[in-house]
UniProtKB/Swiss-Prot annotation:
Keyword Lipid metabolism: no
Gene ablation phenotype (knockout): No visible growth phenotype, decreased energy transfer to photosystem I. Decreased accumulation of phycocyanin (PC), but no major effects on the phycobilisome supercomplex. A double cpcG1/cpcG2 deletion has even less PC. No change in state 2 to state 1 transitions (i.e. energy transfer to PSII).
Topology term for the membrane: Single-pass membrane protein
Subcellular location: Cellular thylakoid membrane
Pfam family of the protein (one): PBS_linker_poly
Protein name (database record): Photosystem I-associated linker protein CpcL
An individual GO BP term: photosynthesis
Domain PBS-linker: 11-189
Lineage: Bacteria, Bacillati, Cyanobacteriota, Cyanophyceae, Synechococcales
Length: 249
């Protein structure tokens, strides 16, 4: 037996403010299939859909749904169906649904599929009950079939963070992409089975910043650089003094 969605009250959010301004560089770029798209524009739309559903941190080859992309490029499915396919894929289930509790997963999906943050804990509980009674497919279908989704994105537009920037405010809301893929509870489980142990703090932030040689090699290089620079400087000074007749070479 499935339960109806529990009622919850909306709260004040940027996306509830009526939009009258002209879109600029600070506003979200809208990807839609309204009109004819070139092959490159179609690829950009597909990439935007992956980025919206999986987030930038999960833009990896193993998450690609080749068959779904083929259906979309051949106009067999709409943008909404493509988003639905990504959210119901095995990759999304394993990397997002199975590593989060229902409350956190609800927040992630509302951010990514409806383009806003959750209104309250009551909304988290309401949608968590949908997951418990209808499962992941039922929850995703409820979101994508909702009036809110259809009014804002319809069948042809990739979801995006709505009204992140308001011209009346100095700063906008933080992007939803900052939210990690899993929470502290799942990290504790990983630590319990041996992950993240005995790891020295990194001296670099990204892998491409990692020094390819040992520290001693760089120290020797610095010594050679400074000594060589000093010798070259002395040579230039000696040549100049010789040219002026002050010293003889």
């Amino acid at each position: 037996m499935t339960l109806p969605l529990i009622a919850y009250a909306p709260v004040s959010q940027n996306q509830r403010v009526t939009n009258y301004e002209v879109s600029g560089d600070e506003h979200a770029r809208i990807f839609t299939t309204e009109g004819t798209l070139s092959p490159s524009a179609m690829d950009n739309l597909i990439a935007a859909a992956y980025r919206q559903v999986f987030n930038e941190q999960q833009m990896i080859q193993s998450n690609r749904q080749i068959a779904l992309e083929s259906q979309f490029k051949n106009q067999q499915i709409t943008v909404r169906d493509f988003i639905r396919g990504l959210a119901l894929s095995d990759s999304f289930r394993r990397r997002n649904f199975e590593v989060n509790n229902n409350y956190r997963f609800v927040q992630m999906c509302i951010q990514r599929l409806l383009g806003r943050d959750v209104y309250s804990e009551e909304e988290k509980i309401a949608w968590s009950i949908v997951i418990a009674t209808k499962g992941l497919p039922g929850f995703i279908n409820e979101l994508l079939n909702s009036q809110e989704y259809l009014e804002n994105f319809g069948y042809d537009t990739v979801p995006y963070q709505r009204r992140r920037i308001l011209p009346q405010r100095i700063s906008g809301e933080l992007p939803f992409a900052r939210m990690p893929r899993y929470g502290a509870d799942h990290r504790e489980k990983l630590e319990a089975i041996g992950y993240f142990r005995n790891q020295a703090p990194l001296t670099y932030r990204w892998e491409w910043q990692k020094q390819p040689y040992p520290a001693g090699v760089y120290l020797a290089g610095k010594v050679v650089l400074y000594v060589g620079g000093a010798l070259v400087s002395l040579g230039i000074i000696a040549v100049a003094l010789s040219a002026w007749g002050i010293i003889g070479l």
